[in-house]
A protein has these predicted regions:
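Interdomain motor-coupling "hinge/lid" segment immediately C-terminal to the ATP-binding subdomain
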Residues: 1-58
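Generic recognition of short, well-ordered alpha-helical interface segments
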Residues: 1, 21-25, 41-44, 80, ...
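Alpha-helix boundary recognition
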Residues: 2, 54, 83-86, 164
Length: 252
């Protein structure tokens, strides 16, 4: 997760075992991304949308808030820019599925989406892009298994990366908790055997799954399997498979 999958970064880590040198390489890669974005869009809007991904994920909002990054713009006014970013394969996009069912593509809301970096190692560097490596607390926290809720979106990004690498289009679902008037969110939805599989992601060992439970109650007849991806051991909790994040690539 820290090094990522970029060949230069992986090679540097194997040769030096030095995260600082790896981070320098990843900063160079991000600079190349910025240069390419400027060629695609000389106004710099793509660069701004890209740089804001960590902040947008950190808000826990139900969508990427375009207006918070580009004044006067909305999601439906930057669809072409978003498409250019996705085509560059530097980011992954997850769409809100308004009516989660087997045909997720038919339920996607083009105006409600989240953006993830295609490489989580680059995300770890982008978060602290404007600071010195010594101020990048993600390395220390991940190595000591103390990544807090405030950086939980790093795990959400790695899940997005893994699912995308397995060939899945990315969807999520947000719905209202009628009692608290706050939103529940299913982080990812998969389509399988004419059913859907909801996935909730936890950045810690906590095995509570309120969103999964509420989703199951609402859409029980549509669900095939339920997953909670977290940092502890493989186990079952009723009909929910508690899956360590490192086993996610092997999920069938």
């Amino acid at each position: 997760m820290l090094v990522g999958g970029m060949p230069q970064a992986v090679e540097s880590y194997i040769e030096t075992n030095n995260f600082r040198k790896v981070d320098e390489i990843k900063r160079d890669i991000l600079k190349l991304y910025e240069d390419d974005f400027r060629k695609i869009d000389t106004s710099g809007r793509i660069s701004m949308l890209f740089d804001a991904i960590p902040a947008q994920l950190n808000t826990n909002a139900s969508r990427y808030q375009v207006s918070g990054v580009l004044s006067g713009e909305r999601a439906d006014t930057v669809l072409e820019l978003i498409s250019d970013m996705v085509d560059s394969r530097t980011v992954q996009i997850a769409y809100q599925a308004n009516d989660p069912n087997v045909g997720l593509a038919n339920a996607k809301d083009l105006r409600r989406f989240k953006l993830f970096l295609a490489d989580t190692g680059l995300l770890a560097t982008l978060i602290f892009k404007d600071k010195d490596f010594t101020e990048n607390i993600i390395y220390e926290k991940l190595l000591s298994d103390k990544l807090g809720v405030d950086l939980g979106y790093v795990y959400e990004n790695i899940v997005a990366q893994i699912l995308s690498a397995k060939g899945h289009a990315l969807y999520y679902h947000t719905f209202l908790n009628e009692k608290s008037k706050h939103n529940y969110e299913i982080d990812f939805l998969l389509s399988k055997k004419n059913k859907i599989c909801p996935i909730e992601v936890k950045s810690s060992g906590y095995n509570t799954h309120k969103a999964l439970d509420a989703f199951s109650e609402k859409f029980s007849e549509r669900i095939l399997e339920k997953y909670l991806v977290y940092t502890k051991d493989l186990k079952k909790d009723g009909d929910i498979l508690m899956l360590p994040v490192y086993l996610l690539p092997f999920m069938k």
